UniProtKB/Swiss-Prot annotation:
UniProt name for this protein: Small ribosomal subunit protein uS7c
GO MF terms, alphabetically ordered: rRNA binding; structural constituent of ribosome
Gene3D superfamilies on file: Ribosomal protein S7 domain
Location(s), subcellular: Plastid, Chloroplast
UniProt subunit comment: Part of the 30S ribosomal subunit.
Species: Cornus mas (Cornelian cherry dogwood)
Length: 155
């Protein structure tokens, strides 16, 4: 048993313009090679494009997209008796949001398009509407968990 106490969970800081933690989480995942100002630029341009496309509050579109992509359950590989089973496990809200953000960014990077801001805005709008690669990834994960429901007792 470890003598150390449990680590405190850090809360995400909010970004300077929108004062939103979700925006900051997204910026930190867009970030490459420590270029945070570029990550902010990409996200703010994407938010502007969302504003132009939907003519609604872009933060509500962002929230709706992340809520739509957030998985409730996922599968985890568990080795039992020489064979590996995909065991369905429930996911907490923080981990679910992190997964959703990761899937949204992966889907937008895969998209054909001019620049990252354009691709990200398109993916976020699609996810808010309930379509797109990120939504497909969530549904696929849920299907996998449902198919492997028999192994839930290995948790």
């Amino acid at each position: 048993m470890s003598r150390r106490g449990t680590a405190e969970e850090k809360t995400a800081k909010s970004d300077p313009i929108y004062r939103n933690r979700l925006v900051n989480m997204l910026v930190n995942r867009i970030l490459k090679h420590g270029k945070k100002s570029l990550a902010y630029q990409i996200l703010y341009r994407a938010v502007k494009k969302i504003q132009q496309k939907t003519e609604t509050n872009p933060l509500s579109v962002l929230r709706q997209a992340i809520r739509g992509v957030t998985p409730d359950i996922a599968v985890k590989a568990r080795r039992v008796g020489g064979s590996t089973h995909q065991v369905p496990i429930e996911i907490g809200s923080t981990q679910g949001k992190a997964l959703a953000i990761r899937w949204l960014l992966a889907a937008s990077r895969k998209r054909p398009g001019r620049n990252m801001a354009f691709k990200l805005s398109s993916e976020l709008v699609d996810a808010a509407k309930g379509s797109g690669d990120a939504i497909r990834k969530k549904e696929e994960t849920h299907r996998m968990a449902e198919a492997n429901r028999a192994f839930a007792h290995f948790r």
